[in-house]
Amino acid sequence: GETVAIPANGYVMVFGNDFTSTSWYREPAVGTSVTLTPGLTDSDTSGFPMEEITAMVSGGPRLVENGAICTTLEPGFQEARFTSAVTSRTALGKLADGKLVIVSTGSASIQQLRELMLQLGCVEAVNLDGGGSTALAYQGKLIRSPGRELTTTLQIFTH
């Protein structure tokens, strides 16, 4: 690629292969103005205001939606590692009262994780990651060690 200076108040946008390999993706020319409308799903065309976002992570597939097991696998989550593999997994869920549920399991299929999150009372839940990146620490103690070094972690603190 070419070297390009980033102007003041400019941004660098990086698109992964999942995005650039789609049939509708067209690489924009350097300097092209773009408008981002962040949404939670492909069908969320109205988006939400970024000013209200303090932190955001991505994951998938969805496990529980509106208090029911979500059996639809979005594009990008149809490989065997999501459909049938049994492996270490990490999930986040939300209870009806807004409390957060964090789960780390040593061995589960996506279906087992869906059922577990529903049994725990989650009205919304998402799979974050699995395999070697599954880890969990609580109050400074490592409860589940990762299978490899991690470059990015989700950390939740109370104050």
Whereabouts are the PLM-identified features?
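Gly/Ser/Thr/Pro-rich low-complexity, intrinsically disordered segments
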Residues: 1-159
